[in-house]
Regions:
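A short helix-loop-beta-strand connector motif used in the catalytic cores of GNAT acetyltransferases and
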Residues: 54-65
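Conserved GNAT acetyl-CoA-binding A-motif
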Residues: 113-123
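A short beta-loop-alpha structural element at the N-terminal edge
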Residues: 13-29
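Conserved beta-strand in the GNAT
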Residues: 65, 71-79, 86, 91
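Conserved GNAT-fold acetyl-CoA-binding loop/helix
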Residues: 31-53
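A conserved beta-turn-beta hairpin within the catalytic core of GNAT-like acetyltransferases
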Residues: 80-88, 97, 116, 140-142
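Conserved active-site alpha-helix within GNAT-family acetyltransferase domains
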Residues: 103, 124-143
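Conserved acetyl-CoA pyrophosphate-binding loop and the N-cap/start of the following alpha-helix
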Residues: 96, 100-108
Length: 150
């Protein structure tokens, strides 16, 4: 990677931990919170999300926890079979937002993955998410649309 990102002193100990199958219950709980926060129409329950996460981890995805001071503050789910890599899910716990934890976690993840390019999707109604990703330099490159018959 060309540039290493600087980490704020207050969270200089951001660690990236690759998840395994024993982490699926926590990943599913975080995923449910992500679905709520981004105002997704996904109706899945935590047990359903556990099954889906298990499928992700058994196929072409890797999940990573973000840890600060021995506390898990969030996670990322990355599709590893494409180029650039695809960041399917990124979540920072509500109590850890607003102190650059998301920014530092994202930069630490890029460094860990040793990439300088990554793709994401953000729901159009997720204004805080859109602002966050734009603040990191992301630009819109496509628009995903859906027709739902009433």
């Amino acid at each position: 990677m060309e540039d290493d990102f600087e980490i704020d002193e207050e969270i200089e100990d951001m660690k990236i931990i690759k998840c395994n199958s024993s982490d699926i219950p926590q990943l599913a709980v975080f995923n449910k919170q992500l679905i709520e926060d981004e105002k997704s129409d996904n109706p899945m329950s935590v047990p359903e999300l556990e099954k889906r996460m298990e499928n992700f981890l058994n196929t072409e995805y890797d999940a990573y926890f973000f840890e600060v001071d021995k506390a898990i503050v969030g996670y990322a789910l990355v599709k590893k079979s494409c180029s650039p890599l695809y960041l399917r899910q990124f979540f920072i716990g509500r109590e850890y937002r607003k102190n650059h934890c998301g920014t530092e976690a994202f930069h630490a993840l890029l460094n860990y993955l040793n990439v300088d390019s990554i793709d994401i999707e953000v729901l159009s109604g997720n204004e805080p998410g859109n602002r966050f990703w734009e603040s990191l330099g992301f630009k819109e490159v496509s628009r995903y649309m859906r027709l739902r018959k009433i």
